[in-house]
Amino acid sequence: MISRYEDDPEYHKYLENNDPYGIMTMSALWGADSLTHQNRFSGVSKVYGIDVSYYQGNIDWKKVKNSGVEFVIIRVGYRGYGSAGTLVEDPKFKTYLDGATKAGLKVGVYFYTQAITTAEAKAEAKFVLDRIKGYSLQMPVYYDIESV
């Protein structure tokens, strides 16, 4: 299984995480003093959301909704490492999209980009648009741009 995901840029972040499963629970975030904001945001409403990819495993979307989460950003896919730069759909993308939608969560998507040329960026955009065609998203499409 590991070799299947070695080309996935997020897999390496997952392995480096101190948590053995790469997950922080909502209860950990909402603990007594663990979630704070600067005073300039006093009086501003907080909206809770999560982003998910294959590494979160099977998700009980009803539990997510009941925990107070209002939106979810789901990874559509990523560009693999190396010269091939293969565009890969997240194995859980459609399952997560269907489950989150059925649970009544607002849904958006993200793509983990490794594009280094305009042509690659355009190919990634087409890849995303092809996969979200026919779905009704309530949140934007995001591009996760990180140096790896």
Where are these regions (language model features)?
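Substrate-binding cleft of extracellular glycoside hydrolase catalytic domains
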Residues: S42-V148
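Boundary/entry segment of secreted carbohydrate-active catalytic domains
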Residues: M1-R75
